[in-house]
Amino acid sequence: MNKFFYSLSLLLFFFLCEELRADTVITEIRTEQLVAPVGIDAPAPRLSWQITSTERNVMQTGYHILVSSSPEKLNKNEGDLWDSGKVQSEDSQWVPYAGKQLKSNMRCYWKVKSYTTAGETPWSTSSMWTMGLLSENRWKGVWIGMDKAFEWDSETQWSRLSARYLRKEFMVGKPVKQATIHIAGLGLYELFINGQRVGEQVLAPVPTDYRKTILYNSFDVTSLLTQNKNAIGVTLGNGRFYTMRQNYKPYKIANFGYPKMRLNLIVEYEDGSSETIASDLSWKLTADGPIRSNNEYDGEEYDARKEMDGWNKIGYDDASWLPVQRVSVPTGTLRASMTPNMKVVDRITPVAIHKIGEKYILDMGQNMAGWIRMKIKGAAGDSIRLRFAELLQPDGELYMDNLRDARVTDTYICRGIEKETTWAPRFVYHGFRYVEVTGYPSPELTDFTGEVVSDEM
């Protein structure tokens, strides 16, 4: 009988231990404080995690990290890149990778478990990171663009420069294992593969002092490629590279040149081979598209009559487009953007609308940074204008004095065939609560949405 109770007690002890293990777990897995980042250029990325427990005063006393070159190896607990073994340490933030030397474009898979005052945790869920291109000599191709303005542009104080559209078609002839694209688009860019927009980021890349640093973004685009012909499309906006004020206080406002791009798409095949589709002189460019002007101070002008249906898909006729130019290399060092991107984080409906003369004033109910997305109504050639302000004057008009010479006006010119179409600017943002609407037929609150923009932190 005593042996029976002894065995029962032992089983109960192990059961309680397992319950404890299940109640103390690893969460918030981060690499360089980012969630599964694609494209980092830290040679020894720093790893972080948190311990979550239902018990109080549970403290870490050690950790064990595994980093593998494939998910399969990680699932087998094979840390072929780094097996830290048990490390006696309370550290769970900014723990530097200390394994084999990492290479450009390498994918790394990792997990961690902790030893605590309450026992050993289970392994964390798996995470990963992808290395960027670790130096500029790892990039193929050249910087491309067009170092001139066009006849419809204006380089006066209130500069107007249309967006540049670039495209290239290429063939993928074998089954793809994985594909990663690295892009530096100055001043701002939107990226498309086979007509699909890549990523949720807006106003990318993060602005820098371009004399010192140029940032690039990286994306896993494996699922967007087909084993056949493919197309890459890139739209370049001005951002703060081609500055908002030309030939105006040059001692204060630096201008860095016309928009330009460098891009590497690295395709790795199932048979172990790889190839890089790079920005080179085989690309085509036009600036005669719908974004006629984009200026952070003055707003964006979009002429839908200039839309180029299917320009970022295979088979588009680009015979009228220009060959790109090889343009000068920016002076700043090309680095991975290891910071959360800007994105639309909230959407709000205006709380009121009232008419003043032939105009309408929208009240968003709060100050916000971002833009208005609106439903399109109108005949071909109709012009809809949105002007932005943070305050109203006593007579209900916008208060604009604090904006000095900024025009803060987004303009949409109708194509006339829009049905259930919405539009928002791509390459500008505004700080505002009130919006003056001109040229919009019978506006209602539900015709407009405020898209609030912030970083992903």
Model-identified regions with their sequence ranges:
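Bacterial Sec-dependent N-terminal signal peptides
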Residues: 1-25
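Extracellular/oxidizing-compartment recognition motifs
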Residues: 24-107, 111-457
